[in-house]
Amino acid sequence: MGQQAIKAKNRRLVDAVLKIRAERESKPTPARSVNELPLIAVTCSTGWECYAIVEELTKTLRFRVRALYRTQGTQASARLEALLQDTEAAHPGLLTLHPGVDMNSQEALTRAFRDCAGVVLYVTANTSKAGKITNHGNDPVGGRAAVMRQVLASLGALKANPSVRQVITLIFPTDKVSDFVGDVPKIPWWIRQKLRLSDFLRAEGINVTCIHRPAYYYAMHRVDYTAKTHFRGDSQLSKTMIREDNIPGITPPDFLVNWLDVRDVGKWVGTCFEYPEVFSNQDFSIASCAHTGHQLVEIAEKNNRHGTRFRYRPFPMWLMKTLSAFTAEVVYPLRYAQWYNDRGNGYDFACNEDLADLERVHPRWSFEKELEFWGINDIAPRKKAG
C-alpha cells in the first residue's frame, strides 16, 4: 500500500512538472546573466552525494551554486577546486566555494546562507576529521545530539535569512511499518530521526522539500562517478568486488533492493528548485533502479561478452554482526540491511517498472551502464586446469 501511494504521488508530481515545462517552452523568457540567477547553498559539499548535487546544479546553468564545506586541503576539497576551475573557465561566477563552514555553528551558517534563494541541507551523525570517521552511527557517543545541534544551528540560520524560500533535505526511504505491524526489527535510531527532521523544520515555518532516496551503493560498491579517472583496480574510489562467479551483496538473493546513483540525486534537486510550485513542502521518492540479487546475476550474464557466469553471494550477516563489535564501519550497513528487508521495512519502489514516471523527466542510471563502466562485461572465464 505504501509503495502504491508513493508511485501515485510521483506520477502526480511528474505530470505537474511536465505540464509547467510545456507551458514555459511555449512562452520562452529571455536568458538571464549569471548574476541574475538564484543562489543555492549546498552544505557538506565535499561528501559523495552533495558534491554530485553541486556539479549537477552547475550543469543546469539555472542557478548560482555556493558549495559549503569545512576542511580545506583534503582529497574531497581538491575535487571541488577542480570543478571550480572548470566552471570558471566556461561560466565565471556560477560556482563559489566556501570552506570553513561548521555545521554546528549558527553564526557560520547564517553567513553561508546569506542572499540564498534555496539551501540543500544535509546533516549527519558521523563526526570526522578530514574524512576519517570516528562515529559511524553509534549512538552511545552522542549521535542524536550531534544531528540536532546541526539542525538547530541550520534552523536559526534559515530564520535569519528570509531570502531562503525553499530547503531540500535528503532522507532515507519512507517507514511503512512502524506502529502499523508487529514483529519487525526496531528501526535504527538515525533512520527514525532523519525521517522526522523535515516535519520538524516545517513545523518551524520552513518550506522543506524532502527527497527520499536509498543508499548509493551497488553490490557492495559505492556508486561514485566523481573520480576523474575510472578503472578496476586498488583505488578505494573505483574498486568493485564483482568478478566471475561472484556478485556480492548484503541482502538475501530474492529480496528486491532500491539503488541510487548520486548523479540522479543532483538532477532531481535541480528539478525541485526549478519547479517550486510543484515541490514546495512535498515529500518525493526517487531511486535509480530496483533489482533482486538473482536479477543482478541475470543482467551481468546477459551483458558479458564472453559468456562468463556469475553467482550472487550475500555477505554473511553473522560476520557483519561479529565485525560490528570491533569496528564501527560496518554498523551502518548492518543496521540498514536489518531494517530494509523482508521482516522490516520495504523500499519505496516495488520493481524497476515503478520508476518509469521518473524517467519521463530524467534518464536514470542503470546497472547495465555501470557494468560497462566497471569493465565487468569484459571479464573472461578463467581457464580450467587440464
Where are these regions (language model features)?
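General small-molecule cofactor/ligand-binding pocket signal
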Residues: 66, 96-99, 209, 309-315
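Oxidoreductase cofactor-interface core, primarily capturing Rossmann-like NAD(P)-dependent enzymes
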Residues: 9-64, 68-80, 104-106, 130-132, ...
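Terminal hydrophobic/aromatic helix or amphipathic segment near a protein terminus
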Residues: 83, 284, 297-348, 386
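Amphipathic terminal alpha-helices
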Residues: 3-25, 351-386
